[in-house]
Amino acid sequence: MPRRADPARKPAMLAAIIDALRDRPLSSVTFRSLADALDVSTYALVYHFGTHDELVVEIVQALVARQEGIIDAERSSSPTLEAHLEAVRESWHGAMQPLTRPLLRLELEAALLEVVRPDLRAGARDVHSRWLQWQTDSLMRLGVDRDRAALEARLLVDQLYGLQFDLVISGDDSGISALSQRAIDDYRDRITALLAAPLA
C-alpha cells in the first residue's frame, strides 16, 4: 500500500523555497537549483508542484497572500479614517522590515514577469488592483464619492509602490521612511479636508 502524502510537507517546502529566493532572482528558479538549495530531490518538487510554471505560480501566490490579512482586518473594522490610516501604516511598516525586503523584490519581479508571461496568471499584477480597490472602498465607506475616492486611492498606492521600488534599489531606509510618512500625512490631510467639506 503506498505511503500517504504528508499534507504539511508541501507548505513547508514552499516556505523553504521562498526563503531560498531571498537572495536570488525569481527568474533563476529551476527544479535543480531549488532541489540543491532545499536538499531534496527534483522528483519531490515535481511531485508536489507539477510543472515549472505551476511551481512559479505557487511561489507568487504565496508572496501575494501575505498582504491579504491587513486588507481583510481593516475591512472588518468600523469605518474610521484613523483605522484606515493605521492599516496603511501597518502595511508600510511591514514592508520596511529587513526580513520583508527581499520579498518586496520578489513581488515586483513577479509582477513584471507576468507582464511578459500573462499566461502564468499567478496574481502578482492583481495585487496593485487589489490595493486600489481596497483604498477606494475604504474611502467610500467614509463618505467620499467614488470618483474622488478612486483618484485619491491611486495617488497614494502609486506613491507607495514607487517608494517600495526605490527602497529595493537604493536601500535608503531613513530617506524612504521619511517620504512614506510625508505621503501618508498628505493623504490624511486631503481626506480630512474632503470629509469636512460641505456636500454640494
Describe the residue ranges of each PLM region.
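N-terminal intrinsically disordered/low-complexity leader segments
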Residues: 1-8, 198-200
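Helix-turn-helix
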Residues: 12, 16, 20-58
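Solvent-exposed, amphipathic alpha-helical segments
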Residues: 12, 16-24, 69-73, 106, ...
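Residues in soluble alpha-helical coiled-coils and helical-bundle/repeat scaffolds
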Residues: 50-54, 76-79, 115, 119, ...
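Hydrophobic alpha-helical connector segments
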Residues: 58, 71-104, 152-156
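Short, basic, alpha-helical segments at the C-terminal edge of helix-turn-helix-like DNA-binding modules
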Residues: 61-68
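Amphipathic alpha-helical packing segments from all-alpha helical-bundle domains
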Residues: 68-74, 98-108, 115-143, 154, ...
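Hydrophobic/aromatic-rich alpha-helical bundle segments in the mid-to-C-terminal region
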Residues: 120-125, 141-200
